[in-house]
Amino acid sequence: MDELIRKALFKPYLKLNKQSSETQQDSWPECRSLLILHEGDSPTLAYFEAAIRSRFPGARCQLVDTLTTPAIEVDKGTAIVVIRFISTEWQREIVRNIDDLSQVVYFMDDDLFDPSALTALPKAYRTKIIRRSAAQHRWITTHCDTIWVSTPYLANKYAHLNPDVVPAQPTPRLLAVTRPGKIA
């Protein structure tokens, strides 16, 4: 079944339609507002939120949980970073606002572009990930300006997409020392 899904829905990521040799990070307009789209409190958000924020110095950042937020109001020049998955409803929401966005970035910390990289996962979870990845495949290549990845391995594997490596930078909450509680 996984192989049928892969063959039917996945085409190799050859390039991003919006990406050109002239589109470099240095040429992006100044960003005053950043929306980080994520699904709930995830390890990916905890480990990469600070690193993503640091790429937009001076920008007002808003975390948008796409599981609980149905729509957004976008200021002109806002940048959006999509973490891992983007639902069909949110794909439409971004497209509705695309003319006001300075850039759309897709970030992945696992190899979601290659179903064969997921073979070690339990079958039900692997099938879910493959289906979700396939559902956003064409949208990413059409609407994202750039791809960010978490490791040099992913950057090398997808070098033809010119990805940037965003190293993990855990949120201060993860690094805070807390006192253990006592149970009476």
Model region roles, listed by residue range:
Residues 2-91:
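N-terminal pre-catalytic "stem/leader" segment of glycosyltransferase-like enzymes
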Residues 24-30, 173-184:
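Nucleotide-sugar donor-binding and catalytic loop/hinge architecture
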Residues 37-38, 139-141, 158:
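Intrinsically disordered, low-complexity linkers and terminal regions
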Residues 47-48, 115-120, 161, 177-180:
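Short aromatic-enriched loop/helix-cap "lid" or pocket-rim segments at secondary-structure transitions
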Residues 56, 62-143, 149-153:
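Extended catalytic core of nucleotide-activated donor transferases of GT-like folds
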Residues 61, 104, 163-167:
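Conserved beta-strand scaffold positions in the cores of enzyme catalytic domains, especially
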Residues 122-126, 165-167, 182-183:
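Short, hinge-like loop/turn segments at secondary-structure boundaries
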Residues 145-178:
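Donor nucleotide-sugar binding/catalytic pocket of nucleotide-sugar-dependent glycosyltransferases
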